[in-house]
A protein has these predicted regions:
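Alpha-helical recognition segments enriched in aromatics with Gly/Pro capping
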Residues: 1-32, 49, 99, 104, ...
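Short, well-structured beta-strand/strand-turn elements
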Residues: 61-63, 133-139, 365, 429-431
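Phosphate-binding beta-loop-alpha motif at adenosine-nucleotide cofactor sites
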Residues: 109-117
């Protein structure tokens, strides 16, 4: 079976065929580092980490680029609010992002460009758009993109161009030609970062950043562009308008977008106070539990977060690990179950179905090659299912375990069972095997 991916551009699943055989170039919009990462970041990061790893598992060489937005209105406003230097703010938050992503099993991108490092490329791209007649200047404001000049504007979000260029939008800037015209270069304001440009001192708009960085690092066209569904419009729509107008080339072949995270059936947002940071969750849950929670839902569907749903994921994950810890090691691979796993993943990264295959494998009493197959699946899932956890056993529990061992040697089974119940009440299970007694945290 060939990998099929849902392409937002065509609104259908398509067979994935890279531009260059066995080689994939992929760009995913990274975080704006105005704050620490939240559960929405975790979902996007895990989604595209899974895609990247599965592509590698399928035999592709992958060049994975994910940017860091380190200059933007949110960052400037946050720095003003805290009275902190912008560079210090972004470096501190970037460190938090990278640390937290690592704890949920996400690998660093092959290239992780910062927007501030590519301003010359952004200026060059705006100049090319200007030469082709796609831009205009609003005095004391900035350089804008005229969306009416790009005939395919709206094709990614499946909106009619004529609806997007009308000026009926309330509060639209009076000087804008069309309601969806967007800024390419913002003229500098007091106490804000700036760079020299042909239009005067200023800084790049958000949309031009990704267009310039992806073109410079990957070249056009490239295979996959990813991000959250909230980026489809206007961010990714505007990227297409910029890049295709400037280069006269197709920008991207496959557009892949992950669904949003709701908290107790309400969209997660700071203003509602239902905002969950990765760091807060890691106080109570292992990073791999968060990863398990994310892959338990299909990446395109919205996922509802609550304490109970994460507790359910924790219980399922720990049960799975406990079952696997009792399996005998073997190098054999069960081709039947591995094919089922591949078939699920090839169907637009159907991770919940692939997870069900894993559960079916470990529960199948007659299946051979379980550990060998799990090792293959782990190349994509990276749930640390085979990692032995070192558990700290309290002294009181150790004494009970030792007493039970003595009762077993004396064949005092009744007292041994009583001690087992006391150990379990303390939160630990004991399993008597041919290799000795194994103790696990319940």
């Amino acid at each position: 079976m060939t990998l099929k991916l849902y392409n937002t551009l065509t609104r259908k699943k398509e067979n994935f065929k890279p531009i260059k055989k066995n080689s994939v170039r992929m760009y995913v919009c990274g975080p704006t580092v105005n704050d620490v990462p939240h559960l929405g970041h975790a979902r996007q990061q895990i989604t595209f980490d899974i895609l990247r790893k599965y592509l590698k598992f399928s035999g592709f060489e992958v060049k994975f680029v994910s940017n860091i937005t380190d200059i933007e209105d949110k960052i400037i406003n946050k720095a003003k609010e805290l009275g902190e230097d912008i560079k210090k703010l972004t470096e501190r938050n970037l460190k938090s992002h990278l640390e937290d992503y690592g704890k949920i099993g996400v690998d660093k991108p092959d290239v992780q460009p910062k927007a501030t490092e590519y301003v010359p490329e952004m200026i060059d791209l705006i100049k090319r758009l200007e030469q082709k007649g796609y831009t205009y200047v609003i005095k004391n404001d900035g350089v804008y993109y005229d969306v009416s000049k790009f005939k395919d504007y709206g094709k990614l979000s499946h909106q009619k161009t004529e609806d997007l260029i009308s000026l009926k939008k309330v509060n639209a800037k009076e000087d804008k030609k069309n309601k969806e015209d967007f800024v390419l270069w913002k003229f500098s304001k007091p106490n804000e970062p700036w760079w020299d440009s042909p239009w005067g001192k200023g800084r790049p708009g958000w949309h031009i950043e990704c267009s310039a960085m992806s073109e410079k690092i990957l070249g056009l066209p490239f295979d996959i562009h990813g991000g959250g569904q909230d980026l489809i419009f206007p961010h990714h729509e505007d990227e297409i308008a910029q890049s295709e107008a400037a280069t006269d080339k197709k920008f991207v072949n496959y557009w892949v977008h992950n669904g949003m995270v709701n908290v107790d059936n309400v969209k997660m947002s700071k203003s509602l106070g239902n905002f969950k940071t990765i760091r807060d969750l890691l106080k109570d849950y292992d990073g791999r539990v968060i990863r398990y929670f994310v892959i338990s839902s299909h990446y395109r569907k919205p996922v509802d977060f609550s304490k109970s749903t994460l507790d359910d994921a924790k219980n399922s994950y720990e049960r799975l690990k406990n079952i696997i810890s009792d399996l005998k090691d073997d190098k054999e691979v069960n081709t039947k179950y591995l094919k089922e796993f591949r078939d699920s993943m090839d169907d637009d990264l159907n991770t919940p179905e692939a997870l069900a295959v894993l559960w079916k494998l470990v529960r199948d009493k007659d299946a051979k090659g379980k550990i060998g197959t799990i090792k293959e699946i782990e190349k994509t899932f990276e749930l640390d299912l085979l990692k032995e956890e070192k558990i700290e056993i309290p002294i009181e529990v150790k004494k009970l375990i030792k007493e039970r061992e003595e009762m077993r040697k004396k064949k005092n089974w009744e007292e041994a069972d009583n001690l087992r119940r006391r150990i379990e009440k303390a939160g630990y299970s004991v399993d008597d095997t041919s290799e000795g007694t194994k103790v696990k945290k319940i």
